[in-house]
């Protein structure tokens, strides 16, 4: 067999009745790409909740019976480039990015990823992550760990509210998630937001203090609402929040939202990336994300506050902001654990456990 003909192994599923598995296909590296595409040999890919959420929601009658590949975040090396590809993307370049798809035959938990760098954005050249001598991870692991979560956090802060100042105040529900990790670093180091309050378990408070939160409130010691209310009255001089960002799925503040969120006229926002209820990742249903209450909050013209569903928005240039923050040392992608390719099931189980503190990454090389 020619060296240009390789076996491409990918982690795939067909629908929500089939398990995730490794499938293999023959790939001719001489002809598998178009003139405007590149072939990336993937070194690492990160898992995100969207991976097993889409798996569990995949009805074969609606979404077909073809293999669908896991993951969106990736890092790797360009090994082929079509003749019409912009010359900023060359063979040998180390790149990372987010390959957006819902039920794509192409995904990033694969050994070879084919994409159009002009359309399949964001993609960027990898930057070196500042590391100490005992750091166990290489740059490919770090590079795969941040695009989707960083992009979600940046888009939440950038796309809805434009007038952040040192007097601004933000409440983060779910301070320990990877999105919230990026959120607090972006809020403090890029937008220079004055006060960021986080809600997390009492056991996570010491860890999260080091991330840049100004104040932390436990959700497992009394009422969340009452605990935040006390902080607001005693420490924040009863000032309300410019944004409440929810990364876990919560509805506790809705009945008393006017006590915590500034008026709609002041350009305040409630932004969720997880819906109004915490999802059980082992038993996902469409109702967890497309509930009647969520729809009403989104379309109700009479509600007294701005409610939005957050998601990464590649055109806002978050990938370059992330690169700059990484180079400056103001953001370092958090890694929970790293698995080899054939340990993909353990990696998925780790993320589904809700115990991961940082990104779960799978290595191909």
Swiss-Prot record:
Do the record's keywords include Ribonucleoprotein? no
Superkingdom classification of source = Eukaryota
Q: Which Pfam families match?
A: ADH_N (PF08240), ADH_zinc_N_2 (PF13602)
Q: Which InterPro entries match?
A: ADH-like_N (IPR013154), GroES-like_sf (IPR011032), NAD(P)-bd_dom_sf (IPR036291), YIM1/Zinc_Alcohol_DH_Fams (IPR050700)
Q: Where in the cell is it found?
A: Lipid droplet; Mitochondrion
Record keywords: Lipid droplet, Mitochondrion
- Major localization listed first in the record, in broad terms: other
According to the UniProt record, one GO cellular component term is: lipid droplet
UniProt keyword annotation of Mitochondrion present? yes
To which protein family does this belong?
Belongs to the YIM1 family.
Record-given protein name: Protein YIM1
